[in-house]
């Protein structure tokens, strides 16, 4: 009977691999959520639903001049 119980229990390395997989999955979801930017009614939100200030939002495929002008505009309002 003792051999049967030992075979039924998962090895500690298997449990460790499963826990590490879950940790990596959660971290990747968190990283991806921080890169998603949504515009709703003129306000920007990140992937987690937190409101972003205009100075924190930079268009992904904008040229350098567009980014520079946007930063200058946001500095004038503050």
Swiss-Prot record:
The chain crosses the membrane at residues 13-33. It is a single-pass membrane protein. One of its GO terms (cellular component) is membrane. Keywords: Membrane, Transmembrane, Transmembrane helix. It is found in: Membrane. It comes from the Archaea. Its main location: membrane. This is Uncharacterized protein MJ0270. It comes from Methanocaldococcus jannaschii (strain ATCC 43067 / DSM 2661 / JAL-1 / JCM 10045 / NBRC 100440) (Methanococcus jannaschii). The lineage of its organism: Archaea, Methanobacteriati, Methanobacteriota, Methanomada group, Methanococci.
């Amino acid at each position: 009977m003792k051999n049967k119980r030992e075979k039924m229990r998962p090895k500690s390395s298997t449990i460790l691999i499963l826990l590490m997989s879950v940790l990596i999955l959660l971290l990747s979801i968190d990283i991806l959520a921080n890169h998603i930017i949504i515009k709703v009614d003129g306000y920007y939100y990140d992937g987690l639903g937190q409101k972003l200030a205009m100075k924190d939002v930079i268009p992904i495929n904008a040229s350098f001049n567009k980014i520079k002008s946007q930063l200058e505009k946001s500095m004038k309002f503050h």
